[in-house]
Amino acid sequence: MSIKHWMASSVSVTALVMTALLNITAVSAEEKGLVDPRNDAFEQNHPDQYQSWKKTSESVEIEDALAEDPNMVILWAGYGFAKDYNKARGHFYALDDVRQTLRTGGPQDAKSGPMPMACWSCKSPDVARVIDERGEDGYFEGKWARLGAEIANPIGCADCHDTRSEKFKNGEPELALTRPYVERAFQAINKPFEQQSRLDKQASVCAQCHVEYYFTGPTKAVKFPWDMGTGVQQMEEYYDALGFADWTHAVSKAPMLKAQHPGFETWREGIHGKNKVVCVDCHMPKVKKEDGTVYTDHKVGNPFDRFEDTCAQCHTQSKDQLREIVSTRKAQVLNMKLTAEKQIVAAHFEAGAAWKAGATEEEMKPILQDIRHAQWRWDYAIASHGVHMHAPEVALEVLGTAVDRAADARTKLVRLLATKGITEPVQIPDISTKAAAQKALGMDMEKMNAEKQHFLKTVVPDWDKAAAERESKY
């Protein structure tokens, strides 16, 4: 990077910090009766919950999903997930992970970077605070870096609870939806939060983030595509009617959809959801202390880690028996996932070859639609974390339809390529590793990593300093 570029970056960083410092002069959230985003502010009234929440920091390891499955680099060619995709860690690391991922780039001022403000939406209770203070448009408008100094606390208390209520102050949970767009989504499926049962509310607060969503309008605001329902077919029809695409695929030129993490939607269709076994039953069980005190364990994690408090509350099988059942289902889903990936990856490269051979937009349109639908269905299944446990039958069925759609695309491509004089199989480059797949796409990973490291060293410390100054006035 040139000296000139570094100097310009330093000036931009200064401007970004000054913008953040100007925000510090605002009256504190507590004084205005707004959301307090600090998780430790609630330790005194909820000590057990807070201490167990802190234990989500124990999931230290970062698992590189692209290194584990390089096919995904090709499937997301031209989109941020081809740069970097790690498996989720504990809530404690939500801010660290979104700051560090290559997907958010290395912005040097409030107006640069590849992502919108919406990418903070599931990462911090500061989001609820900023929406409270500025309104939804005031939160969503602009680039991700615009309010970086405002988003300072990882996922915690004020994301799921009405921390301003008297009930919460007196030790009760008082669950709440803290994002207005989530309230609208539940109204769209005729399940307004205030009319939901206790069990439904326990699932709905998790659904604020563990769902499919997209960015819409000039501010790139978050919206759930539930207007026609929450099933894979219904959301596909919604997106098609809207003419929406997250991006255009770099190889096939297909108008693609990127499923986020529709865990709530797949859970609803599975055996647990249909029997009202909700998220907290398995991931945040009630536990008893030595003194007899019962509280909800906020160390969100694997149910097998607390088997007696989770699975054993309903199941009569032993831990080993249930683990074997889950392991078998996971292997079945993985096998179908890889089968779908092989077909969709091939379809992308074959579509790319068809374009190079002179195919027209009219000839390609139905093929690209098949590819779009195939990958949407694959992504819907694999992005639903824990789907092999929540709804394995749903995952297998949806992945089966992904294979079918990909086969439809490839059948049409064989015929089209033949009309262009191409009768030999289309060659697929070396994509055996993450690095090889990224190289095949011409991605400059060295540059991206350098930009990210510069951002982490020059911008993030100033964000943290500005946030600490603001919170010192609470």
Curated annotation (Swiss-Prot):
Top-level taxonomic group: Bacteria
Key words of the record: Calcium, Electron transport, Heme, Iron, Metal-binding, Oxidoreductase, Periplasm, Signal, Transport
Cleavable signal peptide: 1-29
Enzyme Commission code: 1.7.2.2
Family of the protein in this entry: Belongs to the cytochrome c-552 family.
UniProt-listed SUPFAM superfamilies: Multiheme cytochromes
Subcellular location: Periplasm
Residues involved in heme c 2 binding: C157, C160, H161, H298
One of the record's GO cellular component terms: outer membrane-bounded periplasmic space
Protein name: Cytochrome c-552
Cofactor(s) the protein needs: Ca(2+); heme c
One of the protein's GO biological processes: anaerobic electron transport chain
Organism: Vibrio vulnificus (strain YJ016)
Residues at which Ca(2+) binds: E212, Y213, K258, Q260
Stored Gene3D superfamilies: Butyryl-CoA Dehydrogenase, subunit A, domain 3, Flavocytochrome C3, Chain A
